[in-house]
C-alpha cells in the first residue's frame, strides 16, 4: 500500500481511533480481539527493540507475522542507532505492516538511561537522523510517538517541525512530559497549536477513556473554551484492558453473553498463537474482563488455574449458567460508573 493511498483512506475515517502500543498487551491475539469488536480502528503492536529485530531471527519470526483480520497494523520500535532503525523498518515493511512508528516517548528509566525513548527528545540530532534514515529505507509511512517535552511543552512545536521535515508522516503526542511520566492529568491544550503548524496528521494520547471521550478531547474548544482546531485522532491505551468496547461510540455496553464470547475468542487466539506461553497470557488477559463482576473472586481463581482452552470454556459456561437471567440484559444508559456495577444492579433486580 502506498503512503498516498493509505493516508487518503485514513482521512476518510476521521477521527483516527487507534489502539496505543502497550508492552505486554498488544500482541496479535489482543489486536485481533480489538478489531473483532471495532473493525475500523488502527492497532499498534507492542514496541520492540530495533536492534533486537535485526539481530534475533527468533524475535522477528515470533512478533512480526500478523493476520488479515488485524490489519492495518503498525509496529513501533525503539533504540538509538539510525542504521538499526532503518534495517528494522525494512523488515517491518516486508511483513506487510501498514506503517512503522518510532518510540520517542517511553519514560521508563531503564529505557531513557540507554538513550532510547524519551531521551531522543533531548538528543535531537539522533532523533532526526533516525527519521531520515527510516524514510529513505522504506516506502510505507514513518511516524513518531513522543511527549509534550522533557519538562515542559515549550519546544514541542520546533521538535515536531524538525521531525516532519526529516520525513515523519504522522506525529502522536502523549499529553504529558517525560518528567510527569504517567502521573497527574494529561494536558492536551498544547497539541492544537502544534496541529496548526504541521501539515501532517496529529494524534493525541493520554487519559482517553473511550471513543466518545476521545472525540471530545481532540477538539480545541474542549480545552480552551473556544477555537475550532481539531486533531486527526486519538489513541486509547489502558482503558481497553478487558474492554474492547471502549472503541465503540455512544458508550455502548455489551451484554454478558457478548463478553463471554469475546473471552472465549481471546483464549482461543492465545492458544493458537502462543501455545506454551498460553496459560500465563490467558490468565493475565481474561481476568480483566470480569473486574468487579459479582462473584469475581471465584471465577478469577478458576481462570488462573486453566491449562487448556477447554478449561476456559468450562469456566465461561459456569458463569453463563450462574447468571443466565442477565445474559442478554443490556445494562443501563451509563449512569453506573462501570459495566460491572450495571450488571450487579441487573443481578439484584433479577433475584
Language-model segment annotations:
Residues 1-18, 23, 29, 129-132, ...:
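Alpha/beta catalytic cores of nucleotide-metabolism and tRNA/nucleoside-modifying enzymes
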Residues 2-11, 22-95:
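Glycine-rich, positively charged N-terminal anion/phosphate-binding segment
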Residues 13-16, 51-72, 106, 112-114, ...:
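N-terminal small/glycine-rich loop or linker at the start of catalytic domains
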Residues 18, 43-44, 74-76, 101, ...:
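Conserved beta-strand positions in the central sheet of alpha/beta enzyme cores
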Residues 22-24, 48-50, 78-80, 105-107, ...:
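Active-site beta-loop-alpha junctions enriched in small/polar residues
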Residues 33-36, 86-116, 125-200, 226-229:
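Alpha/beta enzyme core
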Residues 60, 115-121, 250-253:
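Short glycine-enriched, charge-decorated loop/helix-capping segments at active-site entrances
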Amino acid at each position: 500500500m502506498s503512503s498516498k493511498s493509505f493516508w487518503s483512506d485514513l482521512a476518510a475515517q476521521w477521527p483516527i481511533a487507534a489502539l496505543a502500543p502497550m508492552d505486554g498487551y498488544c500482541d496479535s491475539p489482543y489486536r485481533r480481539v480489538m478489531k473483532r469488536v471495532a473493525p475500523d480502528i488502527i492497532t499498534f503492536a507492542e514496541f520492540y527493540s530495533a536492534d533486537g529485530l535485526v539481530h534475533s531471527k527468533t524475535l522477528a519470526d515470533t512478533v512480526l507475522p500478523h493476520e488479515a483480520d488485524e490489519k492495518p497494523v503498525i509496529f513501533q520500535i525503539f533504540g538509538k542507532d539510525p542504521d538499526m532503525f532503518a534495517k528494522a523498518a525494512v523488515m517491518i515493511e516486508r511483513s506487510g505492516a501498514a506503517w512503522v512508528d518510532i518510540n520517542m516517548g517511553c519514560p521508563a528509566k531503564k529505557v531513557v538511561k540507554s538513550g532510547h525513548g524519551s531521551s531522543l527528545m533531548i538528543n535531537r540530532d539522533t532523533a532526526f537522523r533516525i527519521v531520515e534514515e527510516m524514510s529513505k529505507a522504506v516506502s510505507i509511512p514513518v511516524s513518531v510517538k513522543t511527549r509534550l517535552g522533557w519538562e515542559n511543552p515549550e519546544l514541542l512545536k520546533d521538535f515536531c517541525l524538525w521531525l516532519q521535515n526529516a520525513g515523519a508522516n504522522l506525529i502522536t503526542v502523549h499529553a504529558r512530559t517525560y518528567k510527569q511520566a504517567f502521573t497527574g492529568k494529561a494536558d492536551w491544550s498544547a497539541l492544537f497549536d502544534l496541529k496548526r503548524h504541521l501539515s501532517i496528521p496529529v494524534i493525541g494520547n493520554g487519559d482517553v477513556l473511550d471513543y466518545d471521550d476521545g472525540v471530545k478531547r481532540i477538539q480545541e474548544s474542549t480545552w480552551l473554551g473556544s477555537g475550532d482546531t481539531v486533531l486527526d485522532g486519538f489513541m486509547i491505551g489502558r482503558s481497553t484492558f478487558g474492554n474492547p468496547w471502549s472503541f465503540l461510540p455512544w458508550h455502548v455496553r455489551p451484554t454478558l453473553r457478548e463478553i463471554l464470547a469475546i473471552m472465549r475468542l481471546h483464549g482461543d487466539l492465545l492458544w493458537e498463537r502462543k501455545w506454551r506461553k498460553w496459560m500465563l497470557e490467558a490468565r493475565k488477559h481474561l481476568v480483566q474482563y470480569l473486574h468487579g463482576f459479582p462473584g469475581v473472586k471465584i471465577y478469577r481463581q478458576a481462570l488462573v488455574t486453566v491449562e487448556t482452552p477447554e478449561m476456559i470454556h468450562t469456566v465461561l459456561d459456569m458463569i453463563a449458567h450462574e447468571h443466565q437471567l442477565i445474559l442478554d440484559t443490556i445494562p443501563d444508559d451509563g449512569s453506573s460508573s462501570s459495566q460491572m456495577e450495571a450488571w450487579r444492579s441487573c443481578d439484584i433486580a433479577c433475584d
